[in-house]
Amino acid sequence: MGSFSITHWLILLVVVVVVFGTSKLRNAGKDLGGAVKGFKEAVKDENTEHAKKHVVLDHDAGTNPPNITGTQSDTTSANKVDDTHNV
């Protein structure tokens, strides 16, 4: 009762072809296929960009990171303050 038999599907197909015509259905199929192809290419491009970023990050991880603690600049600014008080 809940599922359709093959005859119901064939009748539905005939009604759709009569209402929309074969040319509109063919164009809709081409458009749908193009959209799916574009989506797959976008996902593929996103995956390759993501993989390239990981390669670059892994390559950078092997080098010594720069000293970004700021201790050198803090000592020079402290020396400048001390120099002004000593004068």
Swiss-Prot record:
Region annotation (Disordered) ranges: 56-87
Keyword Membrane (UniProt): yes
Biased composition (Polar residues): 64-79
Function according to Swiss-Prot or TrEMBL: Part of the twin-arginine translocation (Tat) system that transports large folded proteins containing a characteristic twin-arginine motif in their signal peptide across membranes. TatA could form the protein-conducting channel of the Tat system.
Domain of life: Bacteria
Family indicated by similarity: Belongs to the TatA/E family.
Gene Ontology MF terms: protein transmembrane transporter activity
Spans through the membrane: 1-21
Principal subcellular localisation of the protein: membrane
GO BP annotations, alphabetical order: protein transport by the Tat complex
Gene Ontology CC annotation, any one: TAT protein transport complex
Name listed for the protein in its UniProt record: Sec-independent protein translocase protein TatA
Membrane topology according to the record: Single-pass membrane protein
Coiled-coil regions, chain positions: none
HAMAP family: TatA_E
Keywords annotated in UniProt: Cell inner membrane, Cell membrane, Membrane, Protein transport, Translocation, Transmembrane, Transmembrane helix, Transport
Subunit structure of this chain's protein: The Tat system comprises two distinct complexes: a TatABC complex, containing multiple copies of TatA, TatB and TatC subunits, and a separate TatA complex, containing only TatA subunits. Substrates initially bind to the TatABC complex, which probably triggers association of the separate TatA complex to form the active translocon.
Protein species of origin: Psychrobacter arcticus (strain DSM 17307 / VKM B-2377 / 273-4)
Pfam families: TatA_B_E
Location in or out of the cell: Cell inner membrane
